[in-house]
């Protein structure tokens, strides 16, 4: 790029690509580029990341950028999700339904039981001083249908209207539940979405992964 200055030029100009600019953070006199969330708490920088080594590029006020590598946690949480489709084809008695939906005689659904197993795994460098930096666990569901509801012990936790993307739910706020019920409602009406909607009425896949709060 070409720069036309008025007055005294700056000592250092950093030109970022669009992708880097979308992943840029400024703390103090430093510019940080990272693909993962970065925030400051009590004067300490933390990166929210997974189980891989992550690179953070740092720009000072002058000089060339330097790369910092944040190591993965020594104690990790591996989460597996087992799914079972029930024989129900009508919304459970506790499912929240609008009056309009209740009037639809053809309004069938599919109900799935989800069982989540949380296992702690220690890497070869872990010892008695190693800490558990678990920040959250995200449950991701790929389903075809108009919308879905997630329940725990008959209580609605959250719901989602299909927009062509996977549905991801943070589980920390719900106490990392082990058993959940998913209700999927059929895709019936042609509605405009940015992404191609996933038609049908079924759960295709459910998975979960953990993220960690790592000091930079």
Where are these regions (language model features)?
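Non-catalytic C-terminal accessory domains or segments of carbohydrate-active enzymes
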Residues: 1-216
């Amino acid at each position: 790029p070409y720069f036309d200055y008025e007055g005294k030029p700056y000592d250092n100009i950093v030109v970022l690509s669009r992708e880097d600019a979308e992943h840029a953070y400024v703390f103090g006199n430093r510019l940080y580029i990272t693909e993962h969330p970065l925030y400051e708490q009590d004067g300490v920088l933390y990166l929210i990341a997974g189980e891989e080594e992550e690179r953070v590029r740092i720009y000072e006020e002058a000089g060339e950028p330097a790369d910092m590598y944040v190591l993965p946690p020594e104690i990790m949480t591996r989460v597996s999700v087992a799914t079972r489709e029930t024989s129900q084809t009508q919304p459970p008695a506790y499912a929240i339904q609008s009056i309009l939906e209740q009037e639809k005689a053809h309004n069938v659904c599919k109900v799935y039981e989800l069982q989540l197993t949380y296992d702690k795994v220690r890497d070869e460098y872990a010892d008695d001083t190693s800490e558990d930096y678990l920040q959250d666990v995200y449950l991701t569901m790929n389903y075809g249908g108009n919308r879905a509801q997630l329940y725990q012990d008959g209580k609605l936790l959250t719901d989602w209207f299909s927009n062509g993307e996977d549905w991801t739910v943070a589980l920390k706020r719900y106490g990392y539940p082990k058993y959940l019920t998913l209700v999927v409602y059929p895709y019936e009406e042609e509605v405009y979405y940015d992404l191609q909607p996933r038609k049908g009425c079924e759960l295709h896949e459910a998975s979960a992964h953990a993220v960690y709060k790592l000091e930079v």
